[in-house]
């Protein structure tokens, strides 16, 4: 069996799809379906069972057995960078992750988890080293602290433990994310409503490492298949502009004039204006597949979003 926490969410459901593509259907999805719309991410996928996240962690703490587990992909977390309830974030993202990590270590189950580029904060160097890490929000701090915890444990770990610092992920199965969905998703919706696509004023100076979710899932699967341990950036290695995203959306639809809107006050000083993954460490594992450019990935995503 393979366990995917957050399996009804954005990246988790894409990992389930990648596992299905390998012929694996013996998958336990763990999630919180209080937002019932997330079920749609699983409708076209095959899984063996579903478990609520609170019931699951209670079983983990109790030491219950789930049979033979080939791997755990831990994608479940509060991923809202705008959430400021630190007690909630640390319980949900940090304590939960530690319990699951130790369960896997005790049983030598390969453990792959979602970290984040939010661990870096306001830096121009995105390398997996302590000197470049300075998160700007409590979400980023929760991910950073778990990475630090993992770093201390890795030398003694007898089974793979692997964290991925996701950069700006976009693509299919993010519809439920609301305001936290990708720029491409929001621009597509604006055009469908007959509006012009909108970018924040000043965003011409912002550049992000936008990475297609299919590529993210592929790296997760490859690292599992190859027994990789460590903490790795997962982006494309190239920063592209928000304008490049908007241009790709407009090109797909064949209409729309890009407008600018004021930059939100609540995001000032808490917003990463630039991200670009240093992929040196990931490439050193032997992973050599290319990543989709914004033009390629957004075109594929638009075709998926607007499929009939």
Swiss-Prot record:
GO terms for biological process: ADP-L-glycero-beta-D-manno-heptose biosynthetic process; carbohydrate metabolic process. Pfam families: Epimerase (PF01370). NADP(+) binds at residues 10-11, 31-32, 38, 53, 75-79, 92, 143, 169, 177. Its EC number is 5.1.3.20. Binds 1 NADP(+) per subunit. One of its GO terms (molecular function) is ADP-glyceromanno-heptose 6-epimerase activity. InterPro entries: Epimerase_deHydtase, Heptose_epim, NAD(P)-bd_dom_sf. The keyword NADP applies. Keywords: Carbohydrate metabolism, Isomerase, NADP. Substrate binds at residues 168, 179, 186, 200-203, 208, 271. Homopentamer. Contains a large N-terminal NADP-binding domain, and a smaller C-terminal substrate-binding domain. This is ADP-L-glycero-D-manno-heptose-6-epimerase. The lineage of its organism: Bacteria, Pseudomonadati, Pseudomonadota, Gammaproteobacteria, Pasteurellales. The gene is hldD.
